[in-house]
Swiss-Prot record:
Cellular localization per UniProt: Cytoplasm
The gene coding this protein: rlmM
GO biological process: methylation; rRNA processing
The reaction(s) this protein catalyses: cytidine(2498) in 23S rRNA + S-adenosyl-L-methionine = 2'-O-methylcytidine(2498) in 23S rRNA + S-adenosyl-L-homocysteine + H(+)
Taxonomic lineage: Bacteria, Pseudomonadati, Pseudomonadota, Gammaproteobacteria, Enterobacterales
GO molecular function terms noted in the UniProt entry: S-adenosylmethionine-dependent methyltransferase activity
Enzyme Commission number(s): 2.1.1.186
Protein name stated in the entry: Ribosomal RNA large subunit methyltransferase M
Length: 366
């Protein structure tokens, strides 16, 4: 199998294509990207027959910025007969996947695909039963086995393939299903909530998002991001010249500091989290984030970079490279991840975790 489907935000296909071409090429997995504007997906076609499987095995999915999900696929199945769509799909998957742990019948995240999604939901149940009978799926769902993907691009027209459970998005279509809390001050709260789901493993939440932690929210007004921190019982310094929602102030967990987020300097040395969603040039925000991390003013940070109209992948890459260079220069070992989230628009969200040990990823550093 030599094709990899990457789901992305509609309108960002070129960025997704540029990124996968760049990162696959650095691993000597060469190919070309098929791009259709506003389609919500990209197909990276490798030159070598087995390189699709090699790509999803060797390149960490967490290193991708513009892809929400990816999976390796075979040739496009077309003109599926309405009276029996299941048999051709089962036939394509037999011998490709054995004992998959989950089935996802998906579409791209576009308005045109909404009607098709209704069909996918109904189609999933009988298809799952047939795939279990054929040995393509296990008799029960398990997160330890490959995920089987059936991706419809039009009625009667789909790609079939799989992703690896340890190197994909755990979410259907790569989108966490979040509900807007009625008491939140703004919809931006969903950006931070999604970021926490995407960047922090669920089994580490109790330790890394613990009750009683101290946090700073730069550019906090009216408090959408502060709300998420308060909800996790943190003490929050909300920095903004604009007013905070009274409902947050009434919790007693928020200290409102009427200052410019770029000029504020923390007066305590036990801040676990700093978050930032300020509307400013990405280079200026990145420089500020580097300053916080180099000086050890926080342990972890989540921040947004607003994107220009052109060369968006290049802009993000340049800023992340600058941040990494600053950390390296000052001997700071850190983990950096970036993703264009479902709730992001013309922006990407970055998570950086400062590690105190020389070797990242140790259990006692989590």
């Amino acid at each position: 199998m030599n094709k990899v489907v990457l789901l992305c935000r509609p309108g960002f296909e070129k960025e997704c294509a540029a990124e996968i071409t760049d990162k696959a090429g650095k691993r000597e997995i060469f190919g070309f990207a098929r791009v259709k504007e506003n389609a919500g997906y990209v197909i990276y076609e490798c030159y070598q027959p087995e390189d699709g499987e090699k790509l999803i095995s060797e390149l960490p999915f967490s290193s991708l910025i513009f892809a929400r999900q990816w999976f390796v696929v075979g040739e496009l199945l077309q003109h599926l007969p309405p009276e029996d769509r299941i048999t051709p799909i089962v036939g394509m998957l037999q011998g490709v996947v054995e004992k998959g742990g989950e089935l996802r019948v998906e579409v791209a995240d576009t308005n045109e695909s909404k009607e098709l999604m209704k069909f996918c939901r109904k189609f999933t149940v009988p298809l799952r039963a047939a795939l279990r009978d054929a040995g393509v799926l296990t008799n029960y769902e398990t997160p330890k086995r490959p995920v089987v993907h059936v991706f419809f691009i039009a009625p009667g027209c789909c790609y079939t393939g799989y992703s690896l459970a340890h190197n994909n998005s755990p979410f259907y279509m790569g989108i966490p299903r979040l509900k807007f809390p009625s008491d939140a001050p703004s919809r931006s709260t969903l950006k931070l909530e999604e970021a926490l789901h995407v960047f922090i493993p669920e089994d580490e939440w109790d330790e890394r998002l613990a009750n009683g932690m101290y946090a700073v929210d730069l550019g906090a007004c009216p408090g959408g991001w502060t709300y998420q921190l308060v909800k996790r019982n943190m003490w929050v310094y909300s920095v903004d010249n604009g007013p905070m929602a009274q409902s947050l102030m009434d919790t007693g967990q928020v200290t409102w500091l009427r200052e410019d987020g770029f000029r504020y300097r923390p007066n305590r040395n036990n801040i676990s989290w700093m978050v930032c969603d300020m509307v400013e040039k990405p280079a200026k925000v990145t420089a500020l984030m580097a300053q916080w991390l180099v000086n050890g003013w926080c342990r972890e940070t989540i921040f947004n970079l607003k994107l220009p109209m052109k060369k968006r992948y290049e802009e993000v890459s340049h800023n992340l490279a600058y941040l990494q260079a600053q950390l390296d220069e000052h001997g700071v070992n850190a983990q950096i991840q970036a993703r264009q989230l479902y709730h992001d628009r013309e922006e990407v969200t970055v998570h950086v975790r400062r590690l105190w040990a020389a070797v990242g990823g140790r259990r006692d550093e989590r």
